[in-house]
Amino acid sequence: MGFYGNLNHMEKRKSGYVTQKQFNDFKNSNNQRLIKIENTLVSQGEQISQLIKVSILQGEQINKLTETVEKQGEQIQTQGETLKLILETLQVINKRLDRLESK
């Protein structure tokens, strides 16, 4: 181990030592990186929460649209049945008219 005129730095050959100041600087640098990562994660967590809320709202909208489409389908089916009855009635009337004309 040798001293090279700097009280903040000592070296040992083939393996290194660091001063308390260097270690604290390294630790502070890592802490700052961790804080940035933590802030990024918090921000991303908030974005995910907002996306989940949007997804839930869109799911509710899809459910409402599905109900509307189902109701419209029922209405179309009812209208089809009504048209079928009207057609049958017209056919009966047409047959009666044909009978009257043939007499």
Curated annotation (Swiss-Prot):
InterPro entries given in the database record: DUF16
Annotated signal peptide: none
Pfam families assigned to the protein according to its UniProt record, in alphabetical order: DUF16 (PF01519)
Gene3D superfamilies noted in UniProt: 6.10.250.40
Domain of life: Bacteria
Similarity field: Belongs to the UPF0134 family.
Name of protein: UPF0134 protein MPN_484
